[in-house]
């Protein structure tokens, strides 16, 4: 019974990860939350003091997100926000913003 429960859980986790990868809008949908502070499509509002995310190299964004998630980089709210995403989701978000101009 325990083995069956474990297999069912693994199947659901795998299916959820595959669903994100198969959805061409997954990165955009996940990144929509970022617009509240960083502006629509990552174009920060002038004078806000927040970093623009649009067009930033994917690796640079991923490193910043990893630093926020681990607590290495100081932040007021990004620690909590970044911890709410899986590494796969953060990768999708970084890919989306890197493609924005």
Language model features: what each stretch is:
Residues 1-7:
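Bacterial N-terminal signal peptides that target proteins for export
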Residues 12-31, 45, 49, 67:
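Electrostatic cytochrome c docking/interface patches
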Residues 21, 40, 81, 96:
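Residue-level hotspots at or immediately adjacent to binding/recognition sites across diverse folds
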Residues 23, 30, 57, 64, ...:
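Stable alpha-helical elements in mature extracytoplasmic
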Residues 32-40, 93:
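The canonical Cys-X-X-Cys-His
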Residues 37-44, 98-99:
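Detector for the c-type heme attachment site
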Residues 42-70, 79:
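Gly/Gly-Pro-rich "capping" loops immediately C-terminal to redox-active cysteine motifs
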Residues 70-73, 82-101:
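C-terminal capping alpha-helices of c-type cytochrome domains
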């Amino acid at each position: 019974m325990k083995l069956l429960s474990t297999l069912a859980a693994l199947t659901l986790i795998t299916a959820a990860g595959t669903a994100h990868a198969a959805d061409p809008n997954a990165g955009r949908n996940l990144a929509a939350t970022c617009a509240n502070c960083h502006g629509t499509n990552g174009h920060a509002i002038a004078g806000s003091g927040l970093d623009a995310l649009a067009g930033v190299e994917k690796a640079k964004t991923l490193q910043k997100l990893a630093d926020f998630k681990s607590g290495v980089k100081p932040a007021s709210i990004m620690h909590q926000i970044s911890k709410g995403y899986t590494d796969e989701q953060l990768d999708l978000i970084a890919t989306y913003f890197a493609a924005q101009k």
